[in-house]
Amino acid sequence: MSEVLPLITRRGDRIAFVSGLRTPFARQATAYHGVPALELGKLVTSELLVRTGIDPELIELLVFGQVVQMPEAPNIAREIVLGTGMSVHTDAYSVSRACATSFQAVANVAESIMAGTVEVGIAGGADSSSVLPIGVSKALARTLVDMNKARTLGQKLKLLSGLRPKDLLPVAPAVAEYSTGLRMGDTAEQMAKTYGITREEQDELAHRSHKLAAQAWESGVLRDEVMTAYVPPYEKALSEDNNVRHDSALEQYSRLRPAFDRRHGTVTAANSTPLTDGAAAVLMMSESRAKSLGLTPLGYLRSYAFSAIGVQRDMLLGPAYASPLALARAGVKLADLTLIDMHEAFAAQTLANLKLFASDEFARHQLGRNAALGEVDRAKFNVLGGSIAYGHPFAATGARMITQTLNELRRRGGGLGLTTACAAGGLGAAMVLEVTP
């Protein structure tokens, strides 16, 4: 559906974001090495409650996501509730939409508020690429199940004798799409070739991302939305993202070799987002509930949309498909936006989506629209840098983008912002945010 869909409660309330917070993001195996995503999620949620000053007992719903799952704690949301002082009666469940996971968490909390089943909720996500669910081979897994049913030592030894040495090796988590076997970088390479995205363009975008993120940190605008994280063994604190290159120089990017297509590729480690650890969350409630609690909203959720396309080609075009829906449901055009924040999984993916925003042919043949969304004004685009610089803890990125965009809109005196992301599985997400002066 693409008609205007007002996001209001039965009482006519808008859906308010009251506060947002994240941990500093850290590259894999650095500051959060050995710290599970659950602990990062509890850390940011606890601090969010403290900073807001809201009684934890008032939280009626927590929806949280995690992409790299922890088998020992499959419902990260419920564990966060139990570990942060909220009421045991606070409902909680976990979601996963790959890189758009916290967008989904926000949508779910918004829907519950609109339905009237809750008035106050928290949405967010956490991921750790440093604490991974290392598995075992299928042969060993089957043998272990059979051994559990074996009654005698002889039966167990017979089962073990059928294993080969290679069956005992650990199995690292897959980094490719289950349905295609393609890595994200393979798709980014394909998109770069299909849409004529050059190596120079990708490196320029990556450099821009780091430069703007460094400026954001140096100016202090991120201080209030990023907590200082103290994690075991509590010897050091992290107060800034450790992936941002404060000394980024464009000429350095050309020195790196392609990471996926080694001979003819243009996607490198420098123009891609790195594996990252971190967590982010937002506090949401109905507009009238915020007023009754004496809380001033950061802004409001004007609309949202999700999309799904094929995974064989162009799998990372989610923003080009989801954004037109979100804008239509908000009743606004691209030119009405004050800010546009797009997840930078890869520079190639980002530039391909921007190119299709302006393509009439794509609009007609793929979206069924008469005309393209339009050319994106780069002065409005990823003005504080993006995921290439900050990093990308999969389930946390959406909440980071929402909080960052709302705060920047407030600094600019209000307006509308579009946040949008691609996701594995050919998925996409987009949300229109509103800040009133």
From Swiss-Prot:
Compartment(s): Cytoplasm
UniProt-listed Enzyme Commission number(s): 2.3.1.16
Give the matching CDD domains: thiolase
Among SUPFAM superfamilies, the record links this protein to:
Thiolase-like
Q: Which reaction does it catalyse?
A: an acyl-CoA + acetyl-CoA = a 3-oxoacyl-CoA + CoA
Q: What does this protein do?
A: Catalyzes the final step of fatty acid oxidation in which acetyl-CoA is released and the CoA ester of a fatty acid two carbons shorter is formed.
What protein am I looking at?
3-ketoacyl-CoA thiolase
Organism of origin is: Pectobacterium carotovorum subsp. carotovorum (strain PC1)
